[in-house]
Amino acid sequence: MTDSSATRPPRLPRRDVHGVLLLDKPLGLSSNDALVRAKRLLRANKAGHTGTLDPLATGLLPLCFGEATKFSQDLLDADKTYEAKVRLGATTTTGDAEGEIVVERLVTCDHDALDAAVARFTGEIEQVPPMYSALKKDGKPLYEYARAGQTVERAARQVTIHAITLLDVDLPAAMFTMRVTCSKGTYIRTLAEDVGEALGCGAHLIGLRRTAVGDLTLEGAVTLEQIDAQADEARPGMLAPVDALLQRCPPVHLDAAAMGRFLQGQRIARRDLPEGQVPPDEGTLARVYGDEGRLLGVARMKEGALRPERLVKL
């Protein structure tokens, strides 16, 4: 009898990995499970995701590793873009294809009516969060009430739909696909249901793919299978650099003297910026680099000086 552990390859130790993984999340996998798998494949010491994507949704799930986790909140707050496939004529218990059909109605709308209905939901709108959501009521997720057959009061929340574009409309099949760019906290399931009610026939979501989070897009995103196929030493190279999260912040480059003071948390007066460096406007958050182009952190211009807000150790 042999010891199976003797033939098992030794587990490699974790390592410091810094950057952003643009993951194309597959259908059926939770965001937390995706994070656990990616962290294991990269052998990363520290990782965090930037807001959940439903198991039934696919697409862009940015995962932050190492020093990039200091900026994950920025992606939580960022606008999102989705492509949503909607079936008209039926409402379900969950607002998506996982639920049981509650009511079926005849679809009589034309393309113009669909255009008008969609237009009603652009701009600032109020949404009532769905019962099948992770929002909590008295410390308990709403979906737990829903699974117990209970409906609880939910306060409407203001969200912003920046744009809705109809990509494909097949009214004989009672289906359409729309691209939605929206603020954080927007429920696309609820939007699909609301459009259906505006048309008088009801609707539910049958497919959802996230294509952008802030300035990050699916272009260059990788799958878990693609990471697994790479040699271990090559996997960290699949991450985007930390400053991929900071592209909306103007860059500031410091010389060696100013860099040393900055890394000690000291403010850098406007007059001490290197010659030729354009100072950011008052109140602006800037990404700060050292004299060798290494990201040092972010700082805000306040009262004529750059004040460090978050430092990174790369």
Curated annotation (Swiss-Prot):
Record flagged with keyword tRNA processing: yes
SUPFAM superfamilies xrefs: Pseudouridine synthase (SSF55120), PUA domain-like (SSF88697)
Catalytic machinery residues: 54
Cited InterPro entries: PsdUridine_synth_cat_dom_sf, PsdUridine_synth_N, PUA-like_sf, PUA_sf, tRNA_psdUridine_synth_TruB, tRNA_sdUridine_synth_fam1_C, TruB_C
Database matches in Pfam families: TruB-C_2, TruB_C_2, TruB_N
Catalysed reaction equations from the record: uridine(55) in tRNA = pseudouridine(55) in tRNA
GO biological process, any: mRNA pseudouridine synthesis
UniProtKB keywords: Isomerase, tRNA processing
Molecular function per GO: RNA binding; tRNA pseudouridine(55) synthase activity
EC number from the UniProt entry: 5.4.99.25
Highest taxon of source: Bacteria
Family in the record: Belongs to the pseudouridine synthase TruB family. Type 1 subfamily.
Stated role: Responsible for synthesis of pseudouridine from uracil-55 in the psi GC loop of transfer RNAs.
Protein name, UniProt field: tRNA pseudouridine synthase B
Protein's organism: Cupriavidus metallidurans (strain ATCC 43123 / DSM 2839 / NBRC 102507 / CH34) (Ralstonia metallidurans)
